[in-house]
């Protein structure tokens, strides 16, 4: 939830300002919402997960059945091109946000457990229930704030929510208005990204 993440809060504020600036026929603006971007060169999502697993510090958060959307970087780039072309064709198009993803939600922990053996890592079996993870995140945030530690805590309330809950979205609006279609599917994206992940 946004109230647990300054990053999400500031993105929401920026999006509102961008959409508010839309003036049909004069200045066109839209907002693209790619979800959990990954791929070769990703400095955040998968490298962090892999690093924590190698350090023995990764557990399944929640019951392990949550579905999430991921978006390969090629599809993010393609969505921007689709948006540009759509706005050039229709000067009145704009003022709306569009979710961008693979259009193939995955069971997060199953997906990761299929990946780990290909990186010479064992599948995860240890778990931590969501309420406990959330409370740990809340406590760590308070400690980090009290001692003015700049580095992000190993667990936060926002991360607990992201790792334990469903978060996937319809891309029908992007398909209809922007003619967006994913150019690379999950399986192909993983095969193309795997050599880079193995090199980390």
What are the functions of these language-model segments?
Residues 2-33:
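Active-site Tyr-X1-5-Lys
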Residues 5, 68-74, 106, 169, ...:
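Residue-level signal for the nucleotide or nucleotide-sugar donor/cofactor binding architecture
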Residues 9, 13-14, 42-48, 62-86, ...:
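Substrate-positioning beta->alpha
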Residues 28-31, 59-60, 91-93:
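Conserved active-site beta-strand element of glycosyltransferases/polysaccharide synthases
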Residues 35, 40:
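Proline-glycine-enriched beta-turn/loop adjacent to the NAD(P) cofactor-binding site
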Residues 48-70, 124-166:
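Alpha-helical membrane-targeting segments
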Residues 86-154, 171, 187-194:
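Mid/C-terminal beta-alpha module of Rossmann-like enzyme folds, strongest
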Residues 169-177, 181-200:
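Amphipathic terminal alpha-helices
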């Amino acid at each position: 939830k946004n109230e647990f993440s300054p990053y999400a809060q500031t993105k929401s504020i920026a999006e509102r300002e961008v959409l508010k600036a839309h003036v049909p026929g004069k200045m066109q603006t839209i907002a693209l919402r790619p979800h959990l971007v990954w791929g070769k060169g990703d400095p955040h999502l998968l490298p962090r997960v892999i690093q924590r697993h190698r350090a023995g510090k990764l557990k399944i958060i929640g019951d392990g059945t949550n579905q999430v959307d991921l978006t390969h970087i090629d599809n993010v780039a393609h969505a921007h091109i689709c948006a540009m072309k759509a706005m050039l064709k229709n000067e009145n198009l704009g003022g709306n946000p569009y979710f961008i993803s693979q259009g193939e939600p995955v069971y997060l922990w199953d997906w990761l457990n299929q990946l780990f053996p290909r990186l010479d890592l064992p599948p995860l079996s240890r778990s931590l229930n969501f309420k406990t993870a959330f409370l740990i995140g809340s406590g760590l945030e308070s400690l980090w704030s009290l001692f003015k530690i700049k580095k992000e805590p190993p667990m936060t309330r926002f991360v607990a929510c992201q790792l334990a809950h469903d978060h996937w979205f319809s891309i029908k609006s992007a398909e209809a208005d922007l003619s967006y279609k994913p150019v690379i599917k999950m399986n192909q994206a993983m095969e193309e990204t795997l050599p880079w992940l193995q090199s980390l």
